[in-house]
């Protein structure tokens, strides 16, 4: 990293870690020793190289054994940190509770550690005189099932995220601490990673020394069933798709399907121009056993898809834009990075104020590039956009909570289930953020007479300094300045009114769709995208009629705030038993809603929740309602232009 880029973060870190003595004055911990202040990180090389040897062969118990050797240069108190603020997660999610049997020795003698009482991911030890290194060992107890966390090891594959299985010395920038890792895999397994391999013999991979900053950003997917696909043959820098699967048959991708993924790489090059990596590795798990994931890294990404992703791609609509989204993050989020997320260590809190760019614009470009590449048709993308427009345009939560505030959700909610999602709002900066960028794109196209677009912003903002992968921070003012260079406007007001508005000022975010030549309408049949997607997931949608969604067992999974179901006192968890005297099914529910249209006959529904039964009568008569985008005659099809593949 460039020192100037981290100056503000260094000052913040000094305030955070330097506050320890003051905190001690509030109350002294009842421990057998004094806690030393955690040193603020400094931009100086850590003396020596930390070795980390990982054994991931215990598949039955899913236990990973880790051994580290950490050089030290003097006696006295020392703090080792377990990463807490994991890049890409946008919150303090480092699972320190998964670490067990922590042992630390020096010169063969055990050293007793004590956990820091304020920064509980920190472990303090006393380095004895004459010691030149600490030997650290522990077990990473990975989840056995999903109730304990995301499953990262199965009998056929594993997902190593190094930052979940390491300790590092406090007091130094992550970019200034060097690790030398090795990984032992089960016999016969192969792997993909952005790390540079020095050797791989008898199941032991030895990787080149790397800074902690990049080490934590370079996970591994490994498995018994592995395939690597070149997505840019003869290109300027390698782009590879590393696939692991539950079964070897799941690796059977057809050449036309692979070509669509190659077109994704081509369309990204045409959009951005520059590349900010020396090689890029998609890590892809085709599995229903490994925990689901879509997580960006600078030179790789972690992705998991349905087991039919290659063998029956038409049945995996929900996975279509995943790789595109994570690939875009190499430019937006990893190379260009919000300044308040560019922290010097993995334990300093990040701030999320620009996630509507980091994630929102990535969501936008991910869907656009997926469509331009042909992985998604224009018709299906318009259906997806209709669902997004309906969800956020009619969100009851807009009455009280600004979209800007939702950037804090990864910190305050951490993706826990919500009782009333439509009112609480969640990580709306993804999809509503994408609507804002569609608004900006169509406005630029309209005002410039079609001569300029958000593509020009992408080229100017991300398409410079080709080959550089030193993070380049950005601020709100940088965004505004670049937009103004593309098409003059009061962009600060344009953006802030959309980000900060609540209540009566929170207009439905549909201007981009209408300026794009379409309008949101509701019809009695789901659009093709929604029909296919909900068929995959076993979901049934009556959100815009009765205000409920149900699963394949007729159990209500969500209730829309202020809907007929809400007014009737229903919540998620109720099972629909019967409708109008007939056994419940999605078809029966839909038929009852249709039969009540335009008359006064109520819809009678019997429901069960545990041992409780109740009957509800809905005085609803507007029929089934599903979102669609309808072409506005006589207007330019700017959405069509946006989604069309680029030829130069």
Model-derived regions: residue spans:
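Non-catalytic architectural context of zinc metalloproteases
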Residues: 44-46, 57, 63, 67-69, ...
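Ligand-binding face of N-terminal immunoglobulin V-set domains in extracellular IgSF glycoproteins
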Residues: 67, 77-82
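N-terminal, polar/Ser/Thr-rich
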Residues: 25-59
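Envelope-exposed proteins and targeting segments
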Residues: 48, 62-64, 100, 132, ...
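C-terminal recognition in membrane/secretory proteostasis and scaffolding
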Residues: 366, 376-648
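Juxtacatalytic substrate-recognition/specificity segment
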Residues: 68, 230-355, 361, 365
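Extended catalytic-interface subdomain
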Residues: 328-330, 357-379, 388
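Gram-negative bacterial Sec-dependent N-terminal signal peptides
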Residues: 3-23
């Amino acid at each position: 990293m460039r020192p100037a880029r981290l100056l503000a973060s260094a000052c913040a870190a000094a305030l955070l870690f330097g506050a320890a003595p003051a905190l001690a004055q509030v109350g002294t911990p009842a421990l057998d020793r004094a806690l030393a202040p955690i040193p603020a990180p400094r931009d100086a090389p850590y003396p020596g190289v930390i070795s980390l040897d990982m054994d991931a062969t215990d598949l039955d118990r899913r236990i990973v054994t880790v051994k580290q050797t950490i050089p030290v240069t003097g006696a006295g108190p020392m703090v080792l940190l377990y990463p807490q603020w994991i890049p890409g997660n946008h919150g303090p999610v480092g699972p320190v509770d998964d670490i067990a049997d922590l042992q630390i020795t020096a010169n063969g003698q055990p050293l007793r550690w004590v956990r820091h009482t304020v920064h509980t991911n920190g472990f303090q030890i006393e380095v004895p005189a004459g010691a030149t290194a600490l030997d650290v060992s522990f077990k990473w107890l990975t989840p056995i099932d999903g109730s304990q966390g995301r499953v990262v090891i199965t009998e056929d594959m594993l997902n190593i995220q190094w930052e979940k299985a390491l300790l590092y010395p406090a007091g130094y920038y992550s970019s200034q601490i060097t690790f030398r890792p090795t990984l032992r895999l089960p016999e016969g397994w192969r792997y993909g990673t952005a790390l540079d391999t020095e050797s791989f013999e008898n199941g032991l991979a030895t990787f080149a020394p790397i800074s902690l900053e990049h080490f934590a950003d370079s996970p591994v997917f490994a498995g018994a069933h592995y395939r690597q696909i070149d997505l840019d043959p003869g290109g300027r820098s390698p782009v590879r798709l590393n696939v692991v699967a539950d079964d070897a048959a799941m690796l059977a991708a057809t050449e036309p399907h692979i070509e669509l993924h190659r077109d994704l790489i081509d369309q990204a090059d045409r959009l951005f121009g520059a590349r900010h990596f020396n090689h890029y590795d998609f890590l892809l798990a085709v599995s229903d056993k490994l925990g689901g994931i879509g997580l960006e890294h600078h030179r790789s990404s972690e992705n998991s898809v349905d087991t039919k992703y290659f063998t029956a791609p038409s049945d995996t609509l929900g996975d279509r834009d995943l790789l595109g989204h994570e690939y875009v993050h190499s430019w937006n989020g990893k190379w260009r990075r919000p300044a308040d997320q560019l922290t010097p260590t993995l334990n300093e809190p990040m701030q999320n104020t620009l996630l509507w760019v980091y994630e929102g614009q990535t969501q936008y470009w991910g869907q656009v590039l997926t469509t331009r590449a042909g992985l998604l048709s224009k018709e299906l993308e318009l259906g997806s956009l209709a669902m997004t427009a309906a969800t956020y345009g009619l969100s009851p939560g807009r009455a009280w909570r600004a979209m800007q505030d939702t950037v804090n959700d990864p910190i305050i909610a951490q993706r826990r289930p919500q009782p009333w999602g439509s009112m609480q709002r969640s990580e709306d900066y993804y999809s509503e953020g994408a609507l804002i960028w569609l608004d900006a794109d169509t406005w630029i196209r309209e005002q410039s007479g079609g001569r300029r677009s958000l593509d020009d912003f992408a080229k100017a903002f991300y398409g410079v300094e080709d080959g550089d992968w030193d993070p380049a921070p950005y601020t709100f003012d940088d965004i505004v300045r670049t937009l103004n260079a593309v098409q003059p406007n009061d962009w600060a007001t344009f953006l802030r009114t959309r980000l900060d508005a609540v209540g009566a000022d929170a207009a439905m975010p549909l201007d981009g769709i209408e300026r794009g030549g379409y309008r949101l309408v509701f019809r009695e049949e789901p659009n093709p995208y929604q029909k296919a997607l909900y068929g995959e997931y076993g979901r049934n949608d009556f959100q815009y009629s009765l205000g409920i969604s149900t699963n394949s067992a007729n159990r209500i999974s969500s209730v829309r705030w202020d809907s007929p179901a809400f007014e009737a006192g229903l919540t998620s968890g109720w099972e629909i038993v019967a409708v109008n005297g007939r056994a419940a099914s999605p078809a029966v529910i839909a038929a009852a809603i249709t039969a009540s249209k335009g008359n006064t006959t109520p819809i009678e529904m019997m429901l069960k929740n545990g041992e409780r039964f109740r009957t509800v009568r809905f005085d609803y008569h507007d029929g089934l309602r599903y979102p669609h985008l309808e072409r506005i005659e006589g207007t330019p099809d700017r959405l069509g232009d946006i989604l069309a593949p680029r030829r130069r």
